[in-house]
Each structure stands twice: as C-alpha cells, then as structure tokens.
C-alpha cells in the first residue's frame, strides 16, 4: 500500500484518494508517495499495447487504494475519442529527435493528458471516502491548465471549477478558449497580475483556515486541478513510460538502453513525471530542463540557489512565464530523503524542505544542501530567448517540414545546445506540449509570414501555409459567445471564489 505524505513533514499519511481530494497538505506542503513503485512490467513486453493499458498499469502502481475496475473506468472515460490522434500520444521523429506529441486532446495542450482523467479519479475518490460535500476546484493557469481543467470538470456533478488567469499573460486563442467555456459549474476570471500572482493567491486561499471553515459550513471543500494535486502528476508518468516502449518498438533503443528526456519547463510537474518514470525503472541518462527568459530553473540547476528576486519577462512561450516553480519542492524532498533511514527520512527531509520554502517566502531565495545539489546532477538545464525560439521553429519547419509551437521550440533549442556542448548522442524524447495553433501569431512570425489582424486570422493563415490540420477544439472558436468577462485585482481572488460559490 502506497501512502502520501507532505513534503514539509507533517506526520499524517493519506491514501491516494484522500490526497487527490485534498490537493494540498495541511502544512502547505505537496503530497508525495512514500515509495516510488517499480514498473509493473518489462517495457519490451508492452510493445504494441494501447496507451490506455499502460496508463492504467502505471496509475494502479501508485494509487493502490483504487480497484482495478475503478481505474479501468477512469482510463476508459479519459482516453477515448476526445483525443484525435491514433492511440492518444504519437511519437514522431524529426530533426534527430523523438517528439512526444501530448497535445491531441480537447484543448490542444499536454494538460489534457492528466486533466481528462483527474475528474474521474476525483469523483471515484469522493465516492469511496463518502465525501458528501461539494468540491470546488481552484485553478491558477498560465494558459493551458485552465482550459483543460474547465473542459474536464464542466458539468461534473458535485463539483464547481474556478479558474484564474493573467489577463495580459496568455495568447488570444488561450483566452478565448477559457472565456467561451460552457458548463453551469464553470467560473473564469482574468487577474491584473502574472501567473505567480494567480498561483500564490490560490495557495493562500487553500491555507486560509477561516475561509475554508466558512465554506465548510456551506457544505463545500476546496481542491486543486493544478499540478500541486498528485492526481494531476501521476497520470503524466504514464506517457514517458509509453514513449520508451514506442522507442523500443521502432528500433530506436534496445531494452535497457538509456534515453534523454527534454521538457519545456515552468511549474516543474511535467519533468518531475519523467523523473518518477525513471525511478520506476525507465532508463534515463539526462533530464534536460528547458526554460525561456524566465530562467529561474536554469540558474537553480546550475548553481543550487533558487531566487525569484529577478525581472519577470512576458515571452512568446507564456505557459513558462513562471518564477515560482511549485513542483520543484517534490524533487527536493525526494533528494533530501534519499539514503536516509526509513524511520527518520520523512521527518528530516520535511524539516529541510519546510525551511527552504520559508526562506523563499521571506527572502525570495534559498540554497540547497550539498547532498541535494549532488542529486541534481541527473538534470541538465538551459534556456532560449524569444529570437532563438522563433529561429528553432523556422529551422525545424524548413528543414524537416515539422511544425512546433513556441514551448516545444524552446525545448528543441535547449536540447540542440546541450548536444553541441556535450557531444551526447543518446536518443532523446522531447515533450511536445501544445499545438502550434494555440500560439499561431508567434509561430507565423517565426515563419516570416505577415502579421494578421487577430489570433484567429493567424490560425487560418498558418493552416493555409502548412496544411497541418487545426485541432477541432480550436476551429470556429472566434465565433463562440464569450460567457466569462470578469477581470479582478490580484488581491480579490478570495472574494471571487466566495461570490462564485453562492
């Protein structure tokens, strides 16, 4: 039985179902498994098996309190015709790399991979825990999580979903995806501020005892659809396992041979899922963490010091415009606990992480111990600026006829820089995190196309040039009526939640 504990050391352990419902631990920490299970199969034995089967086996290994029948229902509900690609996640070779295309779901971004199944995991957990309260899902988004969460939870009985996004920090297509969302239980607000303001505001609401008590009296409890929720993170592990199986299938690697994994990284959840896959038994040589000009992670992985005391940049890869990378806390916990006696590991690591997070809160920085810094050696890091991002898009399209969005282009550029610097020819999987059509204006600019009047004209122009099909969720988006018009100050999130839940 695998239980879940807080990264900040609180003693009580939760089942997976309890952790999924709660979202955030009482001491403000994030839930982590008390052990990372071994792969339940040999990857080579799963060649040719459908994505759903692999996803179910990986989730079952972590979420041991869910029954086989429950998880089958979850994966069947999640990974169905909502995904437009054959077998959910294509792996496509281009430019000497293997692109793991995670954007073929309803909202054309990788967030669909986890947020299609989270509502099923959550409602199953609520039933099993006899949770009779309504669950209000609070979500901060830098663009993609919000729409994927709205799509996943729209009209799900027993839930409300409230999303906050930076009013001037998402693409036109992303904003329209959210503000046109249908569903009687959906609530969307732009905020005057950036993603970190939204994420901090949501965390503060979770940690406001009086606010939560007031909701409790009204029969409502809060949970999260952000990757701070372990129910978001664990389903993401499956697609890295699947990628390795596909590389065996197409002869890129022999069983047991190592791969590199490159991930465009903001909140650290996606690359942490790759780390979990390696700890289960997928052979990984290097995790290559790719940032844009908000290169807080590049600097941290290089120096061991994390500092948010820096300028915030609005870039053409807005989903990575983040300075407070929440899921990094989970990695630091695992590295701190490594090698310690089982009886004291949680308490020792929890105290260390709590101290680091307190320092970040009070001093805007922290420096990790030598032990933790040594554990970061499995990670390489780099960043790409906006001009380099555009150049990578053009190079890949012109040389390989392969279309990348801006975030994937950051990853490709950082990988190319890593390969030049190291000579490392290990086969690489690059997480391709969004359809180019979500950032069509930036992609068109990269390809030297003339500017268009709006983001939707850009979509049509990009389609005319490339012939790449427009995801069905983005077609005619500009013709849908806007249903959510609220824009609030970053200090007003709690008021907006209370008003939405009346």
Predicted region positions:
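PLP-dependent amino-acid enzyme catalytic core
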Residues: 1-502
């Amino acid at each position: 039985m695998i239980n879940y504990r807080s990264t900040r050391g609180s003693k009580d352990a939760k089942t997976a179902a309890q952790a999924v419902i709660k979202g955030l631990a009482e001491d403000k920490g994030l839930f982590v498994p008390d052990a990372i299970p071994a792969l339940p199969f040999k990857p080579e034995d799963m060649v040719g098996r459908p994505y759903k089967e692999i996803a179910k086996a990986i989730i079952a290994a972590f979420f041991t309190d869910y029954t086989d029948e429950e998880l089958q229902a979850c994966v069947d509900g999640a990974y169905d015709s909502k995904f437009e690609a054959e077998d959910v996640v294509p792996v496509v070779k281009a430019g000497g790399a293997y692109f793991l295309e995670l954007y073929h779901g309803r909202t054309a971004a990788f967030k669909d991979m986890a947020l299609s199944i989270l509502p099923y995991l959550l409602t199953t957990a609520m039933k099993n825990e006899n949770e009779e309260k309504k669950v209000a899902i609070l979500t901060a988004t830098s663009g993609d999580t919000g729409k994927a969460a709205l799509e996943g939870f729209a009209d799900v009985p027993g839930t409300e979903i409230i999303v906050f996004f930076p009013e001037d920090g998402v693409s036109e297509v992303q904003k329209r995806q959210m503000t046109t969302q249908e569903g009687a239980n959906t609530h969307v607000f732009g905020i005057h501020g950036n993603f970190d303001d939204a994420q901090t505001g949501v965390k503060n609401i979770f940690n406001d005892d009086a606010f939560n008590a007031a909701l409790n009296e009204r029969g409502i409890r809060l949970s999260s659809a952000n990757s701070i929720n372990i129910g978001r993170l664990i389903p993401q592990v499956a697609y890295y396992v699947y990628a390795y199986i596909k590389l065996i299938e197409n002869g890129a690697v022999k069983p047991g041979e190592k791969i590199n994994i490159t991930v465009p990284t903001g909140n650290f959840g996606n690359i942490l899922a790759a780390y979990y896959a390696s700890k289960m038994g997928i052979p990984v040589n290097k995790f290559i963490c790719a940032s844009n000009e908000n290169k807080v992670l590049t600097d941290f992985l290089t120096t061991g010091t994390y500092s948010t005391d820096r300028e915030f940049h609005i870039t053409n890869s807005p989903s990575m415009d983040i300075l407070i990378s929440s899921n990094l806390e989970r990695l630091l916990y695992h590295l701190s606990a490594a090698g310690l006696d089982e009886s004291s590991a949680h308490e020792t690591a929890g105290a260390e992480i709590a101290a680091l997070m307190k320092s970040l809160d009070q001093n805007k920085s922290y420096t990790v111990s030598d032990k933790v810094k040594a554990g970061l050696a499995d990670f390489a890091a780099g960043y790409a600026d906006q001009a380099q991002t555009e150049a990578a898009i053009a190079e890949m399209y012109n040389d390989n006829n392969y279309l990348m969005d801006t975030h994937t282009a950051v990853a490709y550029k950082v990988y190319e820089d890593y390969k030049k610097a190291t000579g490392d020819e290990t086969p690489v999987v690059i997480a391709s995190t969004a359809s180019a059509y979500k950032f069509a204006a930036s992609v068109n600019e990269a390809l030297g196309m003339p500017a268009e009047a709006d983001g939707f004209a850009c979509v049509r122009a990009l389609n005319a040039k490339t012939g790449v099909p427009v995801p069905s969720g983005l077609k005619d988006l500009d013709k849908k009526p806007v249903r959510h018009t609220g824009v609030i100050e970053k200090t007003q999130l709690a008021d907006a939640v209370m008003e939405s839940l009346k």
